[in-house]
Amino acid sequence: MKKLAIFVLLSVLLTGCGSEDPAMTKFKKEMNSFCDNLKSIDANINQITNITADEAGLATATQDLMFQLDKLDDEFAKFSNIDFPTDYDYLEQYADEASDYMTEAVKSYHTVYEDNYTVSMEDYAKENYSRAYKRVQIILDVLHGEDPNA
């Protein structure tokens, strides 16, 4: 729900009156696509419900989760390649960092769920996942004219 609100706010912020700069139009389209795709992946992750007590059910749920996390990593990689308009160029570093953190998170989740589970590796994956989303939140806060440190 929070991601939907962020998407709506971003759409409103980036919608202006009159003619719009082509770079801003492209940026807005790419940001909207990124937010839509995150929302979809988030919904898919939250719908992974076929975890049963048997190994087959757990294996299927794990495969589904890994597939969605891989899609998430792909979306963050695309996000890092978005060309930010000149006024927001300085935010590109946050998009790059978000992608790097998500790649590390997904790699770590694969290790946790497919290779060798350890609490420390799961914590490491969660921390990188959180850091990735924190960078996205900073970008969205700035685009909304809010103080990301507040």
Q: Whereabouts are the PLM-identified features?
A:
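Alpha-helical segments in soluble extracytoplasmic regions
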Residues: 26-100, 104-150
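C-terminal motif of bacterial Sec signal peptides marking the signal peptidase cleavage site
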Residues: 13-16
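Bacterial signal peptide processing site
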Residues: 18-20
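Positively charged n-region of N-terminal signal peptides that target proteins for export
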Residues: 1-4
